[in-house]
Amino acid sequence: MIGATNRRGAIGREILHNIINYEFEGKVFPVNPTKTVIHSIKCYSTILDVPDAVDLAVIVVPKELVLNVVDQCGEKGVKGLVVITAGFKEVGEAGAKLEEKLLAKVRQYGMRMIGPN
């Protein structure tokens, strides 16, 4: 969960809350460079700091950070992404160009993606 937070009303809080409270039985790794613990779970600065293998990353960071996060996921060997972040083709030409770059990175690393947004 990249972009996890404790901030009420934030999508990164709500998704993490749902994952840990509604019968998901796998491991969950919150990622946020400014936190050490979220929802009583150790938090990592980047996906690269997570000691275990990660098969799916849920991404809820600002659009300006998504490409870098995808690179980190690729380096980590993550094969699946769910990109919740908004600001891609739904906002116009600049967003569409950013989405094209995102898709190119996903293909470069051989990942599968749901999203963005």
Question: Regions from the language model: what does each represent?
Answer:
Residues I2-N117:
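Catalytic-core regions of core metabolic enzymes
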